[in-house]
Amino acid sequence: MERNVILAKNAGFCFGVKRAVDEAIKYQKEFGKKIYTLGPLIHNNDVVNYLEDNNIFAIELSDADSLKKGDVVLIRSHGVKESVIKDLTDKGLIVKNATCPYVTNIQLKVKKCYEQGYKIIIVGDKNHPEVIGINGWCNDSAIITNGKTELENIPAKVCVVSQTTEKKETWNKVLNEIVRASKEIVAFNTICSATDVRQKSVQELSKEADLVFVIGGKNSSNTTKLYEICKKECPKSYHIENVKELDESLLEDESVKTIGITAGASTPDWIINEVISKIKEL
């Protein structure tokens, strides 16, 4: 049956993620030995396996104690607390920083405003490594909200930033709450421009598609948010990690004429292309 398969604009690797993967490969070749990343370099199991094949391994911060002087540690795109970089360097480790420049920008804004006496509010997931890292640039003192419950006791002088992959509607909701309660507000909409474009693109795509596949790691924040946006517009939206999770029975529905494909910022082109090729085969 003839079907229309549409790939969303800006699907797949974002600038920061591609840069981190490229840096990891570059340093492995440069040093000619194992490279350690603090946590998975990106939230995609297929890419993590690819990196391991290239002698690049994820470790937890606690594992750094067992590393030897001269071992190479790469800070991933999500970034880390300011103190972590100092601690690793003090251990005699070679520290290479692949923090996404957009995240670095947030970290520096937070540090400056915190030093100027502003209470920091971060709109995002308190358990996400990016948010944990940002909080470390204001002495772990930030108020962190995901917008699901109203903020209480909002200080009079605040600086507001966002996780780069946050939904714009959540940012706007929280900011409106703060505007009603605070007298002095410095607000930086730090949602990554690529995230914003990606979210708008999938919203439009899911309006015209009968079926949507959102490709990306199940532990990927931005992929999950894309899936949530798609599900609102197209009930037949499914989050899959790769072609192995493609449920072929979904394609047997003859009412499905247009299939939308999008992918998170941690999903490489080859995984996207495998899914598209499989759909076209069926």
From Swiss-Prot:
Gene3D superfamilies: 3.40.50.11270, 4-hydroxy-3-methylbut-2-enyl diphosphate reductase, catalytic domain. Coiled coil: none annotated. One of its GO terms (biological process) is isopentenyl diphosphate biosynthetic process, methylerythritol 4-phosphate pathway. It holds the Pfam family LYTB. Its cofactor is [4Fe-4S] cluster. The keyword Phosphoprotein does not apply. InterPro entries: LytB/IspH. Catalyzes the conversion of 1-hydroxy-2-methyl-2-(E)-butenyl 4-diphosphate (HMBPP) into a mixture of isopentenyl diphosphate (IPP) and dimethylallyl diphosphate (DMAPP). Acts in the terminal step of the DOXP/MEP pathway for isoprenoid precursor biosynthesis. This is 4-hydroxy-3-methylbut-2-enyl diphosphate reductase. It comes from Clostridium perfringens (strain 13 / Type A).
